[in-house]
Design a protein with these regions (language model features):
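Secretory targeting signatures
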Residues: 1-39
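Extracytoplasmic/periplasmic terminal helices and flexible tails
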Residues: 2-17, 46-49, 72, 84, ...
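Feature for secretory/organellar precursors and membrane-associated catalytic proteins
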Residues: 21-23, 30-130
Length: 186
């Protein structure tokens, strides 16, 4: 039997184990294609996160899947800079995904980059000097995020260093993230 005949027999077989192998190969190919596409377009193998809180409402909701573009592929546009002619998710500037305090293994925060401060510069009007350069960030939800992250528990007194930024939110798909939120550790 030549290769063409073997492939045809594999493709047409009704045997349970052959059918199972076919399904597994199909899923693996789909994952490989998606991962390759993600790497090319977004610069990341897994370019998405599920929104876990309402801090970005009404522009991102709990359960949304958000596609993230690697910070290596783009530059952050802050709210302050975006006021001229740029917005994302119905507001000025970029929404960034960052590691709080640069820590690994903690849930990343997805909030809007409001402006950039240099070391020693006031972090906000009447506020303390920045201990290092970085972004001042804030969630879009005015009910839950009245203050900058750096004024509260999210990133207290610490501007978000550029190396803490994982990427920039580019697209969202509503509700799909609930699947990920229902499966802890996934």
């Amino acid at each position: 039997m030549n290769l063409k005949e073997t492939f045809h027999a594999f493709k047409e077989s009704d045997n349970f184990f052959v059918s199972l192998a076919r399904d597994i190969i199909t899923v693996l190919l789909a994952v490989l294609i998606f991962a390759s596409f993600s790497q090319v377009v977004f610069g990341m193998w897994t370019p998405m996160v599920a929104v876990e809180s309402g801090s970005m409402e009404p522009h991102m909701n709990v359960g949304d899947i958000v596609f993230i573009q690697s910070i290596d592929r783009t530059q952050v546009v802050t709210y302050e800079e975006g006021m001229d002619n740029y917005n994302s998710f119905k507001n000025y500037g970029d929404v960034i995904l960052y590691k709080p305090y640069g820590q690994e293994g903690v849930t990343p925060i997805i909030h809007r980059a409001m402006y950039y401060v240099e070391e020693g510069e006031q972090m906000w009007e009447g506020g303390p000097a920045a201990p290092h350069a970085g972004y001042i960030t804030k969630g879009d939800n005015e009910m839950t995020n009245r203050y900058y992250d750096q004024q509260g528990q999210v990133s207290y007194m610490m501007p978000v260093k550029e190396e803490w930024v994982i990427g920039i939110a580019r697209y969202r798909i509503p509700y799909i993230g609930y699947l990920r939120l229902m499966l802890p550790g996934f």
